[in-house]
Amino acid sequence: MSRLSIFPDGSTSMDQSSPTPLLVTETPAEIQAELARRGIGFEQWPALQELPLAADQSWILKAYANEIDRVKRDGGYATVDAIRMTPDHPERVALRSKFLAEHTHAEDEVRFFVEGRGLFCLHLGAEVLLTLCERGDLIRVPAGTKHWFDMGGQPAFCAVRWFNNAVGWVATFTGNTISERFPTLD
């Protein structure tokens, strides 16, 4: 089940070791409203069908073609792809480490979870929003938003990704170690 946990970022607190959430909700309408108030897009799409183990990128993109085209058109995104992470992925440790560092992008980060789950952590002013996205969830993080992503130590997800550039995922790391003070997906 999708979940939103809102924490103070701890920058004004003497005790930064174990933040206490200001809000925790698993109600989709409340998640959407809280994120929208902060400029973050969140939608839930019906999960069309189970993803076969052998499903490749073209199969995934075809299964969600109408929804993908709508997001691509509405957001002006140039390209779309699908990424699948498994517990035995050879680069899982390096990728998790990279994604866990706070960063920004020059473009929106838009993800739709076809299967599995991931934790988007958004550092917005004096708040940190931990957004657990699961199968059927779409999140749109605007360009320039400080955030990090946790796919877990044993990642198991497939996500559709939209981009404004042909290069794909390009991050600017902030150097802030804030992500170390907040819960992870595991």
UniProtKB/Swiss-Prot annotation:
Disulfide bonds: none annotated. Ni(2+) binds at residues 103, 105, 109, 147. The record marks 111 as: Important to generate the dianion. Fe(2+) binds at residues 103, 105, 109, 147. The record marks 108 as: May play a role in transmitting local conformational changes. InterPro entries: ARD (IPR004313), ARD_bac (IPR023956), RmlC-like_jellyroll (IPR014710), RmlC_Cupin_sf (IPR011051). Its EC number is 1.13.11.54, 1.13.11.53. Pathway: Amino-acid biosynthesis; L-methionine biosynthesis via salvage pathway; L-methionine from S-methyl-5-thio-alpha-D-ribose 1-phosphate: step 5/6. Pfam families: ARD. It catalyses: 1,2-dihydroxy-5-(methylsulfanyl)pent-1-en-3-one + O2 = 3-(methylsulfanyl)propanoate + CO + formate + 2 H(+); 1,2-dihydroxy-5-(methylsulfanyl)pent-1-en-3-one + O2 = 4-methylsulfanyl-2-oxobutanoate + formate + 2 H(+). One of its GO terms (molecular function) is acireductone dioxygenase (Ni2+-requiring) activity. Residues 10-20 have a biased composition (Polar residues). Residues 1-21 are annotated as: Disordered. Binds 1 Fe(2+) cation per monomer. Binds 1 nickel ion per monomer. Its cofactor is Fe(2+); Ni(2+). GO terms for biological process: L-methionine salvage from methylthioadenosine; L-methionine salvage from S-adenosylmethionine. Keywords: Amino-acid biosynthesis, Dioxygenase, Iron, Metal-binding, Methionine biosynthesis, Nickel, Oxidoreductase. Catalyzes 2 different reactions between oxygen and the acireductone 1,2-dihydroxy-3-keto-5-methylthiopentene (DHK-MTPene) depending upon the metal bound in the active site. Fe-containing acireductone dioxygenase (Fe-ARD) produces formate and 2-keto-4-methylthiobutyrate (KMTB), the alpha-ketoacid precursor of methionine in the methionine recycle pathway. Ni-containing acireductone dioxygenase (Ni-ARD) produces methylthiopropionate, carbon monoxide and formate, and does not lie on the methionine recycle pathway. Belongs to the acireductone dioxygenase (ARD) family. Monomer. PANTHER family: ACIREDUCTONE DIOXYGENASE (PTHR23418:SF0). This is Acireductone dioxygenase. It comes from Synechococcus sp. (strain CC9902).
